[in-house]
Amino acid sequence: MNKIVTILLCGLLVSGISTAQSLLPPMPSVAPAKNVGSVEMGNSDKFEEVQLDLPITDGPFKPNWQSIEANYPGTPQWLRDAKFGIWVHFGPQAAGESGDWYARNLYKEDNNAYANHLKRYGHPSEVGYKDVLRTWNPDKLDPDALTKLYQKAGARFLMIQGVHHDNYDLWNSKYQPWNSVNIGPKRDMLREWADACHKYNMRYGVTFHHEYTWWWWQTAFGSDKQGDKAGVPYDGHLTLADGKGKWWEGYDPRMLYGIDLREYESVDAMAHTGWSPPKAGIFSHHLEYANWFAKQWALRIMDVTENYSPDFIYTDGTVEGPFTGNGTGTGYKCNAMQTVMADYYNRQLKQKGFVDGFSIIKFRHPTNGAVNTAEFDFPDTINSIQPWIREAPVGDWFYAPNFTYHAGSMIRFIIEAIARDGNVALNIPMRPDGSIEEACVRMLEDVGKWMDINGEAVYGSKAWKTLGEGEIINGKLKKLPGGKLGGGQARFKFDAQDIRFTEGKDGSLYVFTMEIPSAEQKVVVKSMAKDKGYLSSEIKEVRLLGYNGNVSWKYTNEGLEIIYPKDAQLCTSAVFRIR
């Protein structure tokens, strides 16, 4: 009997491997790299979009925008109901304790991450990022406990990082051997997070940032320009054959770092800037590799949607979508994004009988089937043209010491977004071992206390007829500073006359003061003055959420005047419900 089971299991394993290999052939061979910056990019405007020959789940959605927009039923109500989520932006780059983009920056001599890497691991020609992966061990990571904490803080969904620009998959990946099950923690971290979300009835999405890995990683193909190691190549140049007898034998570094593309104009120069993508264009001498890269990109996402059933997916970028030939999509043009979306929506139809997921495409124009997102800042006015999520990290996207943890900054960030008809996802920094700092825990608990009192003004809400009122600076309403949440936001001063609005699911109007009024201070809501024309009926009731007593108020030509109770014990933002 055991022999029969073994044979069956072996057959299934071989079948699974052969299926994966048939969908994604081996990485094609490439010619030796030419001199840095010696090759012009192909013209992306004249390059016709390639249609990938990948099978997708049967259904009405086809891998083109026309079909997706025609068949998508609209953004699900659950996103508006949820409003606030936590981003689990965690992976091996936390090991460097150098903030965001540690993997790329450790290969830049003038960067703090390079200095930190030298102290912790050694020189990147000898001990590179691949070796960081091997030793990374987040042994204190407890997705169950963290999901419970995040839910207590008021979050109603999680955004879970599947793969960052470092190209290392945090699940049991079919198409990327450099993953958390094979190398490093030996854990399917995505499965652990998904199980925790199911346990606590939380929605969750998976984020994918590997679209521009191929030009992002070009620093790994360089070398020091000065010192004892000047001219000694970093480990990006290594091949499968170089691994013989080493710990990474059998793992091709090209599957992690990609290939040397510095021959194209601007690629090397842009790799050493703080951010900028290369010049728009096509890697025209590497079209076979580009096609393979795009297929692998798509198949990895489809692997997750098939086996982990996320409530939404997220792709990073700065333009209309991945593989557009410009911005972060520089290098190739193809319908990889449309292929992934069509497969995902058809799969939901097949599994559930309906579609209630969505696809986040960063900075895409209003498109039925896509949700927009952007980092840090807020629009100047209400934006109801398309559903959107505003994202930001507390401290940074990956851990570093000495972050400022301030509940008021998180709360005001949430208010600024929802008053503009948006949603929120905030990253909580996690130490390399997967734990979070005590000050961070206290911050989350304080946010949760505020949400317990004021959640009815947040969940399911929409923007009111006007964004808010208060001090005007350079012709615009004063708002919380953008950027990563830290000392700047914690020190920023509002007063009780800085006001934001939302409308609740039952039609109630909510007035948020961006600072707690002083005892018996008169707060005047000028937007409710008769000449503004915003109110369609008389005010019958004013309640202060979290306060059991009555509130003194009157309606005048100046607007709604409210006296803040002297015995109210509230923090950060007082919220009045108007009916």
What kind of feature is each model-predicted range?
Residues 22-579:
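Mature catalytic domains of secreted/periplasmic carbohydrate-active enzymes
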